[in-house]
């Protein structure tokens, strides 16, 4: 069976792998029918778009970066990641090999993309720079922080009477 699947892949056929979950015999494992939404995404990927980006490697950034103040508090923004997700999905549907570098996002990333999850602006910078030379196209749609706290406490900062001031440092642009 595996030899036949490998032959089909060799000839360019897309194989939808079985899903993981509860099987008919009560065991957990691979062998379930993939869910309908995933099957639909496979069909759309194969027939709905011209494959004008086949062979292209695309990196897309999405979402918000998170800059820690302490282990509990952080500075971020309201970016949902939807724009970056839409760009990544569209490039994938057009045949590109897509890497999505994502910060904090409101939803799950699109299927068929290589996902790299990051937290801070430095994490995102490092992830992009590490992959940049191997990409044909880079789309920067993330909402990256412009500043980070100068001092990050290793413990939760206790509430005190009066105001709290946080000195911020400018961050490098990606």
For the regions a protein language model found, what residue spans apply to each?
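Conserved small/polar residues in nucleotide/adenosyl-binding loops
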Residues: 172-174
């Amino acid at each position: 069976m595996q030899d036949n699947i490998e032959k089909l892949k060799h000839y360019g056929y897309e194989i939808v792998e079985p899903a993981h979950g509860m099987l008919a015999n009560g065991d957990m494992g691979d062998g379930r029918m993939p869910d309908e939404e995933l099957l639909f995404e496979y069909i759309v990927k194969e027939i709905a778009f011209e494959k004008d980006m086949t062979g292209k490697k695309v990196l897309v950034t999405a979402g918000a970066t998170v800059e820690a103040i302490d282990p509990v508090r952080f500075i971020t923004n309201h970016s949902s990641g939807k724009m970056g997700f839409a760009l990544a999905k569209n490039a994938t549907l057009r045949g590109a090999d897509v890497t999505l570098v994502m910060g904090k996002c409101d939803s799950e990333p699109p299927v068929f993309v290589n996902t790299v999850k990051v937290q801070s602006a430095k994490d995102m910078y490092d992830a992009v720079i590490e992959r940049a030379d191997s990409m044909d196209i880079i789309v920067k749609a993330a909402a990256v922080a412009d500043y980070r706290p100068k001092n990050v406490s290793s413990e939760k900062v206790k509430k005190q009477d009066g105001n709290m001031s946080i000195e911020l440092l400018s961050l490098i642009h990606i």
